[in-house]
Amino acid sequence: MGCVESKEAKAASARSKVIDKTLKADREESSRQAKLLLLGAGESGKSTIVKQMKIIYLNGYSKDDCIRMFDVGGQRTERKKWIHCFEGVTAIIFIVAISEYDLTLAEDQNTNRMVESLRLFRSICNNQWFVETSIILFLNKRDLFEAKITKSPLTICFPEYSGANNYEEASRFIQNRFENLSGCEKGKDVYSHFTCATDTNNIQFVFDAVTDVIIKTALKDCGLF
């Protein structure tokens, strides 16, 4: 006599098929999405950049061109949450407020904000999760930096700095300090941009370049670059 499947077994089998179908659809959707992780110390301007993204992409991306952006808190007490966002990252946008070279952390009055950002950037670049992950460096608040640098010398943060206290030389020095920590000499992809988070046109221009990085990463993953 043949074995007759019970109603419960049939229901369980049907549920299993639905779950498998849903998981497959989720994997396919995830493969079409680029995952961007926004990192940086507190007060770097991440929240403002997220607001600009909402303005620029008010209607969102197309179904076939989707980017998911994760903004996590930058203060020390919030960084322990970062590890939960590390898996499957397409690229990292690391944001540093270059105008805060003469300020200290809100949570630690003995630590310079620029020094903290340098330490954090180095730890991200050397993290095992991001060995092959492209990093986009936003040197943010360039407008405030340009207004401040002629009045407040860069030597407050970098005693070894011997250049002029003007935007061109001082900003180039800061850029080099970050890029020297990135491991770019070992082939790691790091893309630097000077940004003003309150300038929508500037952020749109920069984010167009970020999109190019995402496309390049996707092609590299497919062996086409």
Q: Where in the sequence are the language-model features?
A:
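Switch II (G3) loop of P-loop NTPases
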Residues: 69-82, 100-103
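Short amphipathic alpha-helices and their capping/turn segments at secondary-structure boundaries
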Residues: 38, 78-87, 123-127
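Conserved lysine of the Walker
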Residues: 46
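Charged, amphipathic alpha-helical linker segments immediately N-terminal to NTP-binding catalytic cores
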Residues: 1-12
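Conserved GTP-binding G-domain of TRAFAC-class P-loop NTPases and closely related GTPase folds
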Residues: 5, 88-225
